[in-house]
Amino acid sequence: MNRKNLFSYVIVSTFGAILLEAYAQWLGKLWIYPYLNTFIYFLVFVLGFALYWLMIVETYIAAKVLLDHIYKGRHYVTKPYKFERILYYVLASVGIALIMFGTVSLISDYQNYGGYSFSINEITDYKVNFLYILSTFIGVVFVLELFEYTQHKTSFIKDLLHEYPIPFYSILIAFSVTALIMETENIPHHFWIYINWPYENIKFLGLPVSMFLAWPLHYLGFLSLFRAFTKEDSQEIWRGDLIK
């Protein structure tokens, strides 16, 4: 990776980190960092998430390369279906509506609660509606689908439409391994603590099952973001279609 590509990656990874933390941590209060104060948190923010997203990309690519090898051959498509010319614009419109719904609902709820206070290390007794956060993340993915389509790039939904499910299976494999390793390693140390998750009484390894179910969004969200705003470095992410 040359300097230009590295700079692009850092910009995209930082933007992805801001999206994730803004909705899931700063507003969503889904986890806290008990050992960090605000200064240290922002000091390590860019580097920490650059490494985190790199792990997301590399584990996904590793799973995808393995599955592409097992299921010999790739599925190439020379042109999109006719309905795709409209589909991605519809998805983007729905995505914008979902982002607005989630954001406005979060702000409105905080106003009704009595206001918002920024904290990364304190447990709050206010529980955010998880639907608002989920809506926002799905909305972002839908909007990114249009970005990828207008640049004649492959995308997650396009791969599924053209019967290339390897990216979907790769995300499932990669997130299962990564989540299990990261979460079990964190259990005795509590570098981050999960709070305010839906159905948090249903647990696996002492952690909310709903948290594990949300893990694929880390992959889908950042991989889509990375592909939408970079070129050569992200070509392998959804590659399976050859779009002209």
Range-by-range predicted roles:
Residues 1-244:
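Aromatic-rich, lipid-facing transmembrane alpha helices and their immediate juxtamembrane interface loops
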